[in-house]
Structures are given as structure tokens and as C-alpha cells.
């Protein structure tokens, strides 16, 4: 699995979202690298890990990342948040958890109302096999929908998407399955590490209310909503997100 290591200081592992790669965090890298050693992961089937055949399953991927990185705060955006949360719940080397536009459960349920309908991910999976590039384009548009900086964020995501080659279709299907089926809520009350939950006020994929609900289930948690932010608030609101991350990491024992 490809992992870029940039900067010096306390270690921070960054995990990207569906269909993208570690390069998507460029605005955060610019602001955080002077202060931290950043470990930017390309998940299997994505970016420079496109040919990595490791199944996109939480235990396998987390174990491989943990073996290649030092004790660190783990940050997960969107799909990457599931891997980061699983790591925080199972590995002592995870010092803290930062979730950006990610919750333990991405789909709506009778006891989890602030999420999207399951059919959204099922539909993307069906369309992916028929129209690969068109489906990716529609997902990127959903990532930025509602954001105060939607146009510039969409342009950035489009440029990033194929900068390291196209993601593997099999990995994309596995990722959609994770988003559709994973429910890690039971792990939250037992989280021994501090956590930070950063939501976008206008996020159409992961409503801010869902992130605040997840934080409320977690001990040692704090939640922050980025005004005007969409599903990728670290793009259009990089200063605010990076400042929140620096305050959080500084508070982690």
C-alpha cells in the first residue's frame, strides 16, 4: 500500500474518501506539514495503490496501515473515516481520532435518521458497471453539492481524481458496499481515545446532525460544524479545518 510521508513532528495518518487518494488532502498538507509528520495513505485500488489487491475490508486495511506507520492520530474523511474509526476502536497505537464528514453509519435507519438512504449507494454501484466515468463525475458533484465553494471544490476533485490513475472498479464496488453496510456505532461508547468530529454545515452525504450524534455517543469527543462547508470542507475551508486539527492534536495526550 502506497503511503507518502511528508513533514516533521507528531505523526498524523490521513485516509481519503471513495474513489480518490491521498493527494486530495493537498490543502491540509500545505498547512500541516510544517508541524506534523503526515502519513498520506492511498487505499487499495486507489491512486498509487491501484494494483494493491488487499481487500477493501476494515481489518485487513487497518492492520496493513498500522504496520507501516508509527503511533499517531488517525484522520479519516468520508469512507476513510470508517477505517480510522475501526483503528481507533481496536489499536492501542492510535493516539486520537479525527473524523471529517464521516460517521460510524452512513445510511439512514429508524434509530439513525441523520444519514442518506441506502439506495443511494446501491444506485451508484449499479451505475458504476454501466457508466464508470459518469458515475464518478456524479459522485464528485454530490461531494460538493451545497458548499459555499462548490465550483472550486468540484474543479479540485476532478483534477485530483485521475492524477494518479483511475481507481480500480472492484475497489470502488467494495467501498460502496462498506458505505452501505457498515455500522460501527457500538464502538463509540468504548472509545478510549479523544476524538474530533468535523462536519460541513451543507453536507448532503453526511449531515452535520449525524456527526454531532456520533460525537455525543463518544467519550472525550468534541464536534465542530464548518459554516458553509460541504462534504469536503478541508478544500474550501482549509484554514478553519487545519486550525481545528492543530488544536485537537495539541490536546491529545
Swiss-Prot record:
<dbReference type="InterPro" id="IPR050266">
    <property type="entry name" value="AB_hydrolase_sf"/>
</dbReference>
<comment type="similarity">
    <text>Belongs to the AB hydrolase superfamily. Carboxylesterase BioH family.</text>
</comment>
<feature type="active site">
    <location>
        <position position="231"/>
    </location>
</feature>
<comment type="function">
    <text>The physiological role of BioH is to remove the methyl group introduced by BioC when the pimeloyl moiety is complete. It allows to synthesize pimeloyl-ACP via the fatty acid synthetic pathway through the hydrolysis of the ester bonds of pimeloyl-ACP esters.</text>
</comment>
<dbReference type="InterPro" id="IPR010076">
    <property type="entry name" value="BioH"/>
</dbReference>
<feature type="active site">
    <location>
        <position position="203"/>
    </location>
</feature>
<feature type="active site" description="Nucleophile">
    <location>
        <position position="78"/>
    </location>
</feature>
<keyword id="KW-0378">Hydrolase</keyword>
<dbReference type="Pfam" id="PF00561">
    <property type="entry name" value="Abhydrolase_1"/>
</dbReference>
<keyword id="KW-0093">Biotin biosynthesis</keyword>
<keyword id="KW-0963">Cytoplasm</keyword>
<dbReference type="GO" id="GO:0005737">
    <property type="term" value="C:cytoplasm"/>
</dbReference>
<dbReference type="InterPro" id="IPR000073">
    <property type="entry name" value="AB_hydrolase_1"/>
</dbReference>
<feature type="binding site">
    <location>
        <position position="231"/>
    </location>
    <ligand>
        <name>substrate</name>
    </ligand>
</feature>
<dbReference type="GO" id="GO:0009102">
    <property type="term" value="P:biotin biosynthetic process"/>
</dbReference>
<dbReference type="InterPro" id="IPR029058">
    <property type="entry name" value="AB_hydrolase_fold"/>
</dbReference>
<dbReference type="GO" id="GO:0090499">
    <property type="term" value="F:pimelyl-[acyl-carrier protein] methyl ester esterase activity"/>
</dbReference>
<keyword id="KW-0719">Serine esterase</keyword>
<comment type="subunit">
    <text>Monomer.</text>
</comment>
<protein>
    <recommendedName>
        <fullName>Pimeloyl-[acyl-carrier protein] methyl ester esterase</fullName>
        <ecNumber>3.1.1.85</ecNumber>
    </recommendedName>
</protein>
<feature type="binding site">
    <location>
        <position position="18"/>
    </location>
    <ligand>
        <name>substrate</name>
    </ligand>
</feature>
<comment type="pathway">
    <text>Cofactor biosynthesis; biotin biosynthesis.</text>
</comment>
<dbReference type="GO" id="GO:0016020">
    <property type="term" value="C:membrane"/>
</dbReference>
<feature type="binding site">
    <location>
        <begin position="139"/>
        <end position="143"/>
    </location>
    <ligand>
        <name>substrate</name>
    </ligand>
</feature>
<feature type="binding site">
    <location>
        <begin position="78"/>
        <end position="79"/>
    </location>
    <ligand>
        <name>substrate</name>
    </ligand>
</feature>
Amino acid at each position: 500500500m502506497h503511503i507518502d510521508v511528508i513533514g516533521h513532528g507528531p505523526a498524523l495518518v490521513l485516509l481519503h474518501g471513495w474513489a480518490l487518494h491521498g493527494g486530495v488532502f493537498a490543502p491540509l498538507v500545505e498547512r500541516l506539514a510544517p508541524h506534523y509528520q503526515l502519513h498520506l495513505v492511498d487505499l487499495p485500488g486507489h491512486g498509487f495503490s491501484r494494483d494493491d489487491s488487499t481487500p477493501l475490508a476494515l481489518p485487513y486495511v487497518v492492520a496493513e496501515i498500522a504496520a507501516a506507520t508509527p503511533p499517531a492520530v488517525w484522520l479519516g474523511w468520508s469512507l476513510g473515516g470508517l477505517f480510522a474509526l475501526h483503528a481507533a476502536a481496536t489499536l492501542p497505537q492510535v493516539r486520537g481520532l479525527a473524523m471529517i464528514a464521516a460517521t460510524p453509519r452512513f445510511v439512514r435507519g429508524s434509530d439513525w435518521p441523520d444519514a442518506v438512504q441506502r439506495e443511494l449507494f446501491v444506485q451508484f454501484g449499479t451505475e458504476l458497471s454501466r457508466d464508470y466515468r459518469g458515475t464518478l463525475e456524479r459522485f464528485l458533484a454530490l461531494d460538493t453539492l451545497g458548499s459555499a465553494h462548490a465550483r472550486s471544490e468540484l474543479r479540485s476533485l476532478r483534477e485530483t481524481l485521475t492524477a494518479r490513475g483511475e481507481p480500480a472498479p472492484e475497489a470502488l464496488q467494495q467501498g460502496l458496499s462498506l458505505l452501505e453496510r457498515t455500522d460501527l456505532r457500538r464502538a463509540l461508547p468504548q472509545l478510549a481515545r479523544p476524538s474530533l468530529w468535523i462536519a460541513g454545515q451543507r453536507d448532503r452525504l453526511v449531515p452535520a446532525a449525524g456527526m454531532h450524534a456520533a460525537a455525543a455517543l463518544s467519550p472525550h469527543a468534541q464536534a465542530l460544524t464548518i459554516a458553509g462547508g460541504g462534504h469536503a470542507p478541508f478544500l474550501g475551508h482549509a484554514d478553519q479545518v487545519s486550525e481545528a486539527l492543530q488544536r485537537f492534536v495539541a490536546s491529545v495526550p
